[in-house]
Amino acid sequence: MQNRVCHLFGIRYPIIQGGMVWCSGWRLASAVSNAGGLGLLGAGSMHPETLREHIRKCKAATDQPFGVNVPLMYPEIETLMEIIQEEGVKIVFTSAGNPKTWTSKLQQAGIKVAHVVSSSRFAMKCEEAGVDAIVAEGFEAGGHNGREETTTFCLIPAVKKVCSVPLIAAGGIVSGEGILAAEALGAEGVQMGTRFALTEESSAHFNFKDRCLRLNEGDTLLTLKQFSPTRLIKNDFYKLIEEAEQKGASADELKALLGKGRAKKGIFEGDLYEGELEIGQAASQLRQLQTVDEVMKELVEDYRTALRQMQDRQNW
């Protein structure tokens, strides 16, 4: 499974754990890195000094590469980036903003930079900004999404046609078969959020994990489209948002309704009714809470099995 993504980040398998809010602390990131993937800390739900603490704990827990995922719209972005550089982090994934703002600055500090996009148009802007890799995320993904609503199956080939840097697929991938499919479409690695959010090492509340592991197809939907498109589990909060949107609520009204701490309330504190429950469509394929080590071994084994089966079928 060695390729440009593996060489870029110094990892054994081209499997990246998404840096999700309220899920991706040092325990999860270090476990993924120790298992041969790339663990990412989710800075989007951390105060700057909390991030520093998680970076240091992650360093103590693994001698393998790990990184930090940073939403560029974060209000204390300057402080976060200072801490990342001060603590010697070598890999940063950015999202939700202009990649030109930070890419060259981080690279000058010896940091590899990947940026998350939801369209080929934004992917071209990333390549122009000089990023080291691009994460193309389809709208199957949990949490914040692009407005295009392009599926991963359609997005990866489109981005592959216009970009030459290593391409990482994200959105709806939770299995070894999914990894192989992403490679067939042109990706050289995958980023998985949902699969790792539902592990023992994830910092998400047990209530949240348990609910996600009992989902059926169609139990998550994209909402908040007038504000910031987000994939959520249908619950009381989701219904509140849907009613507001049907009545023509403005972006400001939706922002006020969202308020502060909805994601923390749902994902981290386990409020299944009033909280914001962000998870991807592919959660409906999962039924068992596993350790990261179990997940990684299963992904690699299933990938290799699927590859052999594919090769055996090549008779036409």
Q: Across the structure, where does each feature detected by a protein language model lie?
A:
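Active-site entrance/lid segments in N-terminal catalytic domains of soluble metabolic enzymes
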Residues: 1-162
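Active-site metal-binding loops of divalent metal-dependent hydrolases
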Residues: 20, 172-173
